[in-house]
UniProtKB/Swiss-Prot annotation:
This is Phosphate transport system permease protein PstC 1. The gene is pstC1. The chain crosses the membrane at residues 19-39, 93-113, 123-143, 144-164, 181-201, 232-252, 254-274, 295-315. Induction: Transcription slightly induced by phosphate starvation, part of the pstB3-pstS2-pstC1-pstA2 operon. One of its GO terms (molecular function) is phosphate transmembrane transporter activity.
Length: 338
């Protein structure tokens, strides 16, 4: 036993060294990706300027014609790019997905943990994990062939015809479309995000200690009061983390959105049913044509778009970590306030 303890003691520095390397590698990878994107996008950043974030036009110019040099950057004649519709489409579809997915996921996790028999709860939990692993292209195909047309023919017309004509809500009015657009994209993203949030939240609820819950019930609380006063405060910061995981999936999803969004560039969506596109879907759909640009300016612009998406994701995660800390400080410790 002493010999083994000595061996472990001698291996301690090596384990710490390997652990330090493992901790640094993700940070180095993130910095490397950022540096590569910035270097690749530098010409586009310099030429596109701030109007890149306010303009709506997406025009690669005459990629087979003459080229011009502006501010030291070569580009095709007529090339002009604006990313505002892409940013709006990305944020709007992610917001729609979370508005639907968060209550559904948390509610489903609560029902599984609180109401279902143990064996059935385990079976449903396994199904949720399997749903989280479905390839996005399969979900996108289902959305394009079945879900999108169903929404366009049966759900969207009801919403469009009954939505009040008042600011903000009038965005729900208009032509329901043919099964492609912002609403369908957001709903498809919600289908993909629900298993992620629900699985994580389900695991969190299962980790809540039994004694505080039993104490709350012994004091006369109903099951709902126990959930509200004990279970949710215990896992509140974890739920925020689960939502961030889902948001990251929604922001970066590519194939499913490309198949149901309509992939329309250069136009702001007029209503929630309008065809549009997102940053990730644009990078995929435009990469082939960008490679035909002999000046490489189109590729540089796509790199700038990718950099914008990465910055949005990083800012979202930083904000979420702040929310987790705030929720952790303000949430009642289990047992207080019961």
């Amino acid at each position: 036993m002493l010999a083994r303890a000595g061996e472990v003691g001698r291996a301690g520095p090596a384990i710490r060294w390997l652990g330090g390397i493992g901790a640094v590698i993700p940070l180095l990878a993130l910095v490397l990706v950022l540096v590569v994107l910035v270097i690749e996008a530098m010409g586009a950043i310099r030429l596109n300027g701030l109007h890149f974030f306010t303009a709506t036009e997406w025009n690669p110019g005459n990629t087979y014609g003459e080229t011009v040099v502006t501010d030291g950057v070569a580009h095709p004649v007529g090339a002009y790019y604006g990313a505002l519709p892409l940013i709006v489409g990305t944020l709007a579809t992610s917001a729609i997905a979370l508005i639907i997915a968060v209550p559904v996921s948390v509610g489903a996790a609560l029902v599984i943990v609180e109401r279902l028999p143990k064996r059935l709860a385990e079976a449903v939990g396994i199904v949720l994990e399997l749903l989280a692993g479905i390839p996005s292209v399969v979900v996108g195909l289902w959305g394009a062939m079945t879900f999108g047309p169903f929404i366009a023919h049966h759900i969207a017309p009801v919403i469009a015809h009954n939505a009040p004509d008042v600011p903000v809500l009038n965005y729900l009015r208009g032509d329901p479309g043919n099964g492609e657009g912002m609403l369908v994209s957001g709903l498809v993203l919600a289908v993909m995000v629900v298993p992620i949030i629900a699985t994580t939240t389900h695991d969190l609820f299962r980790q809540v200690p039994v004694l505080p819950r039993e104490g709350a019930i012994a004091l006369g609380m109903s099951n709902w009061e126990c959930v509200r006063r004990v279970t949710l405060p215990w896992v509140s910061s974890g739920i925020v983390g689960a939502v961030v995981l889902g948001l990251g999936r929604a922001l970066g999803e590519t194939m499913a959105v490309a198949m149901v969004s309509g992939a329309v560039l250069g136009a702001m969506p007029a209503n929630i049913y309008a065809t549009m596109t997102t940053i990730a879907a644009t990078i995929v759909s435009q990469l082939d044509s960008a490679m035909t640009d002999s000046t490489n300016f189109a590729v540089k612009t796509l790199a700038e778009v990718g950099l914008v998406l990465m910055v949005i994701t990083l800012l979202t995660n930083v904000a979420a970590r702040g929310m987790v800390r705030r929720v952790s400080r303000t949430a009642l410790p289990v047992g207080r306030g019961i």
